[in-house]
Amino acid sequence: MIHKLTSEERATQIAALHGWQAATGRDAIQRQFKFADFNEAFGFMTRVAIKAQEMDHHPEWFNVYDKVEITLSTHEANGVTERDIRLAAFIDSITA
């Protein structure tokens, strides 16, 4: 069984990430990204997709031209877990 983070654990973990925040109205974290153009945004999404597939943990995302919004939540746990934090940390590492 996957352990859903408590609100205290989630707050501590989010604080260690860059730009992530609690999603409104659900137990998830999200972040928005802006790139130079669509090619850069799509390249970023491709790198995230490869890592997500390796982790077997897939983001919810929305893309319009140079903007990407990512929401992370673990469906099996109905909330944020370490898997979300690990994927968010990876995403931070490729956007630093």
Swiss-Prot record:
Pfam families named among the record's database cross-references: Pterin_4a
Catalytic activities: (4aS,6R)-4a-hydroxy-L-erythro-5,6,7,8-tetrahydrobiopterin = (6R)-L-erythro-6,7-dihydrobiopterin + H2O
Enzyme Commission designation: 4.2.1.96
InterPro entries reported for this sequence: PCD_sf, Pterin_deHydtase
GO biological process: tetrahydrobiopterin biosynthetic process
Keywords: Lyase
The keyword Nucleus is annotated on this UniProt entry: no
One Gene Ontology term of the molecular function aspect: 4-alpha-hydroxytetrahydrobiopterin dehydratase activity
Gene3D superfamilies: Transcriptional coactivator/pterin dehydratase (3.30.1360.20)
First-tier enzyme category under EC: lyase
The family this protein is said to belong to: Belongs to the pterin-4-alpha-carbinolamine dehydratase family.
Protein name: Putative pterin-4-alpha-carbinolamine dehydratase
Species the sequence originates in: Paraburkholderia xenovorans (strain LB400)
